[in-house]
Amino acid sequence: MTVSGAIPSMTKNRTLVVGGTGFIGQFITKASLGFGYPTFLLVRPGPVSPSKAVIIKTFQDKGAKVIYGVINDKECMEKILKEYEIDVVISLVGGARLLDQLTLLEAIKSVKTIKRFLPSEFGHDVDRTDPVEPGLTMYKEKRLVRRAVEEYGIPFTNICCNSIASWPYYDNCHPSQVPPPMDQFQIYGDGNTKAYFIDGNDIGKFTMKTIDDIRTLNKNVHFRPSSNCYSINELASLWEKKIGRTLPRFTVTADKLLAHAAENIIPESIVSSFTHDIFINGCQVNFSIDEHSDVEIDTLYPDEKFRSLDDCYEDFVPMVHDKIHAGKSGEIKIKDGKPLVQTGTIEEINKDIKTLVETQPNEEIKKDMKALVEAVPISAMG
């Protein structure tokens, strides 16, 4: 029999989110609550940072129930899964805790009541790509989790949502929290290899749509909207259109990315290894969907649209006008080699950009930037 659509549950699945206060986890938790699922957040016992405390309180106010526990304690997890009658477990644990999921899987296997498990993937299809180290170690650990899920016969869905909608800095873990460059573009390789860029809220929304959809049972779910498939050259042009100015482009070679990855600075080198895999190897676009093991979001929900990358980049425009928190008025602040541009009048913003130009240590780049600033004033941004 052919299943033509999703089969909704009569009752909402009770969903446990592990790592629900993290970067991607917040999108998942928000969507779970938005869809009306009884949502439980697993939080590690002990003190939390003020920022995480705010996140937890916000989700509690929206109806989430906080459960304290750790996934590498089988007895603890068995008790939680039984006591709260959990139906779905979504894991978003970070790289250092990926193998802790193996203990969680033992608990899931023991209770025998979990309808769906979503492991901590939320990126590439780890069985189809081989980044250099140190990223490869992370993928090997994710593969171990996949194999354990299959061995235990646990119903699963692997979310392969590719890249977050942002500028892909090769040395930044969460680039969507940083605006695209205002001084120069770093172009990886020839800049023409494409990748898929997905808004965080879409990752949350579509993930939650899959958890009780029979068509996603024991499948890899791929986020590959053609509308959001861009090369880094195309990303640069999109951002230039947004800010009304042309920025110089400089090539970051494959060797440069590999060298940065080889430095083994965690987590920055992991990001470099993934950047190389995406923009040099083309890991997001160099394979075809296997109808037996894969499904695409576009096929599952053809009437549901992804937020466009053009719209996503609109969110970054106000960020380049935000006031910098500097010790002296009018001071330009550089963080991790990236400018934080302050708000103010057009004259103030132009002054800050010119200050940035004058502090550029590379004379050749400074010359190019100065010419661009004089040719295209900030007033073009509107």
From Swiss-Prot:
Record's keyword annotation contains Disulfide bond: no
Enzyme Commission code: 1.17.1.3
Catalytic residue list: K142 (proton acceptor)
Keyword tags: NADP, Oxidoreductase
Keyword Oxidoreductase part of the UniProt annotation: yes
Reactions catalysed according to its record: (2R,3S)-catechin + NADP(+) + H2O = (2R,3S,4S)-leucocyanidin + NADPH + H(+)
Gene Ontology terms: biological process: lignan biosynthetic process; proanthocyanidin biosynthetic process
SUPFAM superfamilies for this protein: NAD(P)-binding Rossmann-fold domains (SSF51735)
GO MF annotations in UniProt: leucoanthocyanidin reductase activity
Pfam family, one: NmrA
CDD domains reported for this sequence: PCBER_SDR_a
Pathway listed: Flavonoid metabolism; proanthocyanidin biosynthesis
Binding site for NADP(+): G19, G20, T21, G22, F23, I24, G25, R44, K52, R146
PANTHER family, per the entry: LEUCANTHOCYANIDIN REDUCTASE (PTHR43349:SF16), PINORESINOL REDUCTASE-RELATED (PTHR43349)
Assigned protein family: Belongs to the NmrA-type oxidoreductase family. Isoflavone reductase subfamily.
Subunit structure: Monomer.
Known function: Catalyzes the synthesis of catechin from 3,4-cis-leucocyanidin. Also synthesizes afzelechin and gallocatechin.
Name of the protein this chain belongs to: Leucoanthocyanidin reductase
Classification of source organism: Eukaryota, Viridiplantae, Streptophyta, Embryophyta, Tracheophyta
Gene: LAR
